[in-house]
Amino acid sequence: MYKRQGGTLAIFGLIAGGFQGFLTGPASKRFGEWNVAFFGLICATLVLTGYGFVGSLAGVVALMILHGPEGFVHPLMTSMLTKKVPEDAQGELQGGISAVTNVAMLFGTVFFAWTFGHFMAEGRDWQSPDVAYWLAAGCVLVTTVLFAAVTRGETRGEKT
């Protein structure tokens, strides 16, 4: 069982790293940073929802491949923010991004571990490991809507 979990985590890491490392640049040049980041957020929302419904390892692996475009989001959002900040404030921006990322990772780990434990607790009338995925999909959906609303008209269609 643990080898299977380790294997799926390794596959996910390779897929995410491949998208982020090898496809972000070409995709953003062809379609524009905003479009590719938005596509990555939509893929993440749909795939997180799917993880909550899938019932087989093959289904999980298929969803992992579809999850790959989420790897575009962080570098492209960082790039878009970098272009809005003067050169003498780049360090502050990168420090702020790093701080927010670290707090979100800490909060997310605690929150989703609690969610998983709550919905898998013994004696619950309804147990499901899937609720955490559905909550994550909801969080990413809110992020996607906010991204679209806040950046409306700023960089859509702009190819960099």
State the predicted function of each range.
Residues 3-17, 128-130:
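Loop-to-transmembrane helix entry
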Residues 134-160:
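Multi-pass alpha-helical transporter architecture, strongest
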Residues 19-33, 116:
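Helix-to-loop junctions at the C-terminal end of transmembrane segments
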Residues 114-140:
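A membrane-interface helix-boundary motif in multi-pass transporters
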Residues 72-86:
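Intracellular juxtamembrane helix-capping segments at the cytosolic ends
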Residues 90-120:
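A late C-terminal transmembrane helix in Major Facilitator Superfamily
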Residues 35-50:
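Structural signature of the two symmetry-related core transmembrane helices
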Residues 50-63, 73:
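Helix-loop junctions at membrane interfaces in 12-TM secondary transporters
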